């Protein structure tokens, strides 16, 4: 736990910095830029935006595409990382890092993701902040972002210094421990810290360890990583359009929406 306690900014970790710099390098590859233009054409043809919509498309599109790269590069369940997604533009060593805001960008929340395999075992270690957040969930998703496991930050057992461990594995019971059971289709953790007081609060400190004996393969090679990035760029455009379809299909200023996670 000692390395967790020393972190002043739980988002700006060494792992996060390395991940974002790698994402920027891959994002600028000719192959990925060509894919971006294909997705751009696909998206515009699918939505057919108005002039007003088009006026704010370009900047938002860049963030969605870079956000897809950030997320796609953390998909290997045998070599998981804690990665913060949906960030505003910022700098690393005077290098501009694009924003990665996508989906429902809530400025009061910090979102992090961890890839998980259904048969592997992990330990999520962390340290809770000084006060509980309005919302702090460790949600285990399947491929379609449907919840198959959950533990609330309010229910996590901690030590005297607010440190904790969450055991993630296929076992049905871990008595006396923070535990989430994996099941068929388990894909990743989606972790949300909703801040109350930005002057005094800090996101929870987090790190992930895979139990070595459960590791089932080598890391993704470059070809697979690039294929995954391309797939996510396409997926992010398609999903954003799907989620916005109720607004796109209604007259201007019509807000009678129905939210149904099974069909939206």
Where in this protein do the model-derived segments appear?
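A compositional/structural signature for long, glycine/proline-rich flexible linkers
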Residues: 2-264
